[in-house]
């Protein structure tokens, strides 16, 4: 049985802010990874070149445009504070990334949403932590997409000024 002292950790209160969050999945990653380890496809080099081409800062840090990018295995996660980054900047960023990965033969499918977020980059504790409502929604949207596409959450479509950024595809909005 836990003591009151042990359970006191649950009294900690955090300040959550709304963030845009994109979850992108590299399609066919397992095959590309197998070729990489056979020295037949430079997966690492192609990912690096696509990231540089799109102007992405590859490490979790404050960036000039306010968008933080994390990449691991076949997943790319982008976050941006809603109060500081306009949704169209985020959409353009994802579009650039998607195009550059496509040039490398690495096709992306994903989702973009918004929600509360807490992140600790691990500077003090030595490990990082990310909890995001928007990430969960973006991941769920990605799993429902059939083809390489970036699905945009219906809840944020009304915040988009440039109607050419997204198009309606069936019952979903997708990045154009």
Which residue ranges define each predicted feature?
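Catalytic beta-strand-to-alpha-helix segment of the class III nucleotidyl cyclase homology domain
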Residues: 80-176
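Catalytic NTP-binding/metal-coordinating core of nucleotidyl cyclase/transferase enzymes
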Residues: 2-96, 103
């Amino acid at each position: 049985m836990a003591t009151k002292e042990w359970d006191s950790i649950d009294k900690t209160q955090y300040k959550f802010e709304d963030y845009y969050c994109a979850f992108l999945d590299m399609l066919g990653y397992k095959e590309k990874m197998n070729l990489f380890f056979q020295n037949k496809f430079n997966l690492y080099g192609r990912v690096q070149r696509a990231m540089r081409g799109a102007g992405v800062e590859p490490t979790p840090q404050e960036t000039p445009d306010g968008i933080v990018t994390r990449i691991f295995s076949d997943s790319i996660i982008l976050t941006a504070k809603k109060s500081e980054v306009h949704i169209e900047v985020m959409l353009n960023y994802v579009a650039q990334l998607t195009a550059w990965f496509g040039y490398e033969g690495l096709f992306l499918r994903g989702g973009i949403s918004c929600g509360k977020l807490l992140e600790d980059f691990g500077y003090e504790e030595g490990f990082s932590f990310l909890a995001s409502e928007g990430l969960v929604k973006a991941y769920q949207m990605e799993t429902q997409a059939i083809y390489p596409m970036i699905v945009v959450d219906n809840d944020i479509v009304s915040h988009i000024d440039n109607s050419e950024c997204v198009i309606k595809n069936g019952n979903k909005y997708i990045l154009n």
